[in-house]
Amino acid sequence: MKIEPIAFESLGVRSQATLVETKDVRILIDPAVSLAPRRYGLPPHRIEVDTLVELAKKITEKAREADVLIVTHYHYDHHDPGYVVPKEIYRDKVVLVKNPESYINPSQGKVRAPKFLRAIKGLPKEISYADGKEYRFGNTRILVSHPVPHGADVRLGYVIQVFIKDGDSSVLFTSDVEGVPSEEHVKFTLDTKPNFLVIDGPLSYLVGRALTEDQLQVSVKNMERLAKSGLETMVVDHHVLRDLKYREVLSGLYDVAKSSGVKVTTAAEILGRETLQLEAKRRELFAQDNSPAKIPRNLASLLRIDQEG
């Protein structure tokens, strides 16, 4: 099994796009990418936009190679109706999506999910509401969790977690659980016992606004529990990498993982690259070069033309 992070905060954007390749099937999870519209009161920097364009192109290329595309929920860093990544990536694919009709908050259930499903209508070879289901492609098994809250409560909706097993190798993709804040989030990992875990980590940069200090500590403690559950590797990225002090936040996890023989890494590190954290460094970027930028309006069309060419 090959697990390849495509776009994450450590690579410079908001995303969790991940490619999993087994002997039987190529699976691309959450093929989307976005930027924080404001951070520290600042818009995206030119370097962030350039990085987004580069990674949107890579997602488009990887999607072209994939057999199965999975959408775990309807936030724009996890799904795209054709704004940044061309909707044509869904053509002739098996598409597994979060059920848009149950366990979903109003903004996703009434607006985003319907808009996305209308946008890709007629493109996929097959589309399936994946919540709580199991799929097989040759000897590869895809098990999807029942919906769990996007964080400590349900204000931001629900997500589905994805477990993929091929022989002795297995990976679990948590989606946006914000560092496993409850038993509901922990259970799927403990039940499936993956070798490899891709997890988003807590929203530590929003303590006092989106979560309390107590909730942050519970999330980290639960991540430490997972590190002792038989894992070999934990890719910890996405939400927690929006915090420049993420290593300090996760210090207990690093200690527990080391004593348990578990490798804790960012997406960038596992690819042998520098951890960028461009959003978290936005003030620094503007101090060095005052160059705000906007995502090109026709980016998805340009990428589609580029792929066709």
Curated annotation (Swiss-Prot):
SUPFAM superfamilies: Metallo-hydrolase/oxidoreductase. InterPro entries: Metallo-B-lactamas, RibonucZ/Hydroxyglut_hydro, UPF0173_UPF0282_UlaG_hydrolase, UPF0282_hydrls. Signal peptide: none annotated. SMART domains: Lactamase_B (SM00849). Disulfide bonds: none annotated. Belongs to the UPF0282 family. This is UPF0282 protein Msed_0584. It comes from Metallosphaera sedula (strain ATCC 51363 / DSM 5348 / JCM 9185 / NBRC 15509 / TH2).
